[in-house]
Structure formats: C-alpha cells, structure tokens
Amino acid sequence: MKVKSLMRKNPKTVILDTPLSIIWNLLGHKQLHMLPVVDEENRLKGIITAEDLLKNLVPDYRQFFEEYYPNAPTIEDIEEQIEKQTHLTAKDIMNTNVHSASENMELFKALSLLMVNHVRILPVVDDGKKIKGFIVEKDIFRYLFKEKHDLFQKLKKIKK
C-alpha cells in the first residue's frame, strides 16, 4: 500500500515570511500539529510544530525543578518573551531538518521513517519537493489495526 492512499491532502501551509502571530493562531487555535513552510512555488522549506515555538519561549525542562532552579520562569515571563519575539517569522523558527515521504512510498517505509526519526507526522512531497499532504503515524496504526485485523489474527496463530 502506498502513502497516497492514507495521506491527508491539502495541508494548511505558511510561507517563509508568515509572522509569528499567525503561526501561533494556526497551531494554537486551529489545533494543527504541524505547519509546512513553503516557498512561492509551494516547495517544502521546513516545518513548524508547537514544540518549535515553545523551544524559543520555555527554558529547558530541567530548569523547572525548583531545587535546581529556584527562580523558574512564570507564565508572565513567558508572555513577556512572546512579546519580544513578535518580529519573528516562519523562516526564523522553522525546523529545516525535515524528513519527508513521497506519495508512492510504501506505507511501511513511511512508518519506519516516522519511528526511526521519532516524529509522528511526515510531510508528503512530489519529486520537485512541492507539498502534497502529510502522513500521520496514528492513521497508519488505525489502518493496520482496523483494516488489517486478519493479518494480526494470523500473527497470533504463528506465535502459538
């Protein structure tokens, strides 16, 4: 089975100059998990996740342990940091180390990419790196566990 049969099409994208305020709105209020960043020709240049945004705002988790860091930042400190970063754009915060899949990639290869790279979503691009959609780990698992129930029944018999 190919990625194109399970991928989610027409993803919401942002361009390199999209302001941080719009990105916050899309990831926060629209409950998107990933925003592909594209150029004028819709070619994938990077991705932005909620984690990418938070890395700029929240100190390393170890700093939250009060015994090691008694002056841990407050929500107000984080709000102040957001205000300081309003000039940032997608190109400033995007992750350019992006793993992607192609529409004709085998589903199990895409699943392997997801697992090896510790990501839950892969952008799907064509040969020209134009964004076509994205494949989500849970969609693959849902397919495997619901649609291929008979496969797992056979595996159970083999184990016995």
Where are these regions (language model features)?
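Bateman/CBS regulatory modules and CBS-like beta-alpha motifs in cytosolic regions of diverse proteins
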Residues: 1-32, 37-40, 44-45, 69-113, ...
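Residue-level detector of secondary-structure transition/capping positions
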Residues: 14, 28-31, 52, 61, ...
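Short hydrophobic beta-strand motif reused across regulatory alpha/beta modules
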Residues: 47-49, 53, 134-141
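A short, polar/charged loop-to-alpha-helix boundary motif
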Residues: 54-70, 141-155
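Contiguous N-terminal and early-domain "leader" segments and peripheral loops that mark the onset or edge
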Residues: 55-61, 106-109, 118, 130
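Extended hydrophobic
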Residues: 115-116, 120-123, 127, 136, ...
